[in-house]
Amino acid sequence: MRVLASAPAKIILFGEHSVVYGKPAIAAAINLRTYVWAEFNERGAIKIEAKDIRVPGLTVSFSEDEIYFESDYGKAAEVLSYVRQAIELVREEADKNGRGITVSITSQIPVGAGLGSSAAVAVATIGAVSRLLGLELTNEEIGKLGHRVELLVQGASSGIDPTVSAIGGFIHYEKGKFEPLPFMELPIVVGYTGSSGSTKELVAMVRRTREEMPEIIEPILLSMGKVVEKAKEILLSDLEEKIRFERLGKLMNINHGLLDALGVSTKKLSELVYAARTAGALGAKITGAGGGGCMYALAPEKQSEVATAITIAGGTPMITEISKEGLRIEEVIP
């Protein structure tokens, strides 16, 4: 038996950094996906084949007394711990710890870009392996298992990434609580700088600045929280699409300015943001921790022009849209 599952990437639409201080955030799944095939093997080992994960590939086998590294190329290795923990967690849930499982991974999501590649591969792996082992799980349950994987690997996790990847669409998050929001099409372009910042270091930097100048930083964080609530109000409204796009674009630009004030933008991120706006995007901002990684632009009827502008500015564009679906079982071969 073989099972193919897929799970989407995510972007933080609004509220990164301020969410650390109890403010809300809105995230959404996007149509860049990680695909995982799962099947049994006779060796009793966990075997991971990652031949196309937007960095050079690798194949590694784990068993009780041996590890086989056929190749190892930098960031691709980061995938291994998430996949292995996901498989072990599902085998434990299904009470089938001894079964050998091979997973094969392909992905459209660049690793280390702040688009939730680790959560997507964990969620897709859980989806494929749970079906293979006959474990019936809802997408919400799979999202919770994905959160457990992140806690095991990272030691800390809000759960935003695996929840969005499992459920899809828009998610409002505040103080540990998730609320799905109504779906609407958002024609966006993601721009990747080609480098990544350390979320841990950037969060610590903002914290230090807040401790040094609370009277300045607190109002910025408060404003960011209000941006999120205004965006939620727009997503819940029955305004015509054109007006919703325009207002969301304005909020994106405001949110980017506030993030820049916190010091988490970079020259390259700003170049991509302003190139997108000049090319006709209604709004453009950092998504994620900053310091590198990605920005995104809202570009109805201008996606090609914005993508070209991002390329000229030295970024890697990805034309995409919001994914209504989260985890999908794509194929089951008996």
From Swiss-Prot:
Residues given in the record as ATP binding sites: P110, V111, G112, A113, G114, L115, G116, S117, S118, A119, A120
Active site: D161 (proton acceptor)
One example GO MF annotation: mevalonate kinase activity
Pathway connected to this protein: Isoprenoid biosynthesis; isopentenyl diphosphate biosynthesis via mevalonate pathway; isopentenyl diphosphate from (R)-mevalonate: step 1/3
InterPro entries (UniProt xref): GHMP_kinase_C_dom, GHMP_kinase_C_sf, GHMP_kinase_N_dom, GHMP_knse_ATP-bd_CS, Mev_gal_kin, Mevalonate_kinase_arc, Ribosomal_Su5_D2-typ_SF, Ribsml_uS5_D2-typ_fold_subgr
Cofactor dependence: Mg(2+)
EC number(s) stated in the UniProt entry for this protein: 2.7.1.36
Transmembrane segment boundaries: none
Family: Belongs to the GHMP kinase family. Mevalonate kinase subfamily.
Subunit description: Homodimer.
PANTHER family: MEVALONATE KINASE
Protein name: Mevalonate kinase
Taxonomic source organism: Thermococcus gammatolerans (strain DSM 15229 / JCM 11827 / EJ3)
Lineage, uppermost ranks: Archaea, Methanobacteriati, Methanobacteriota, Thermococci, Thermococcales
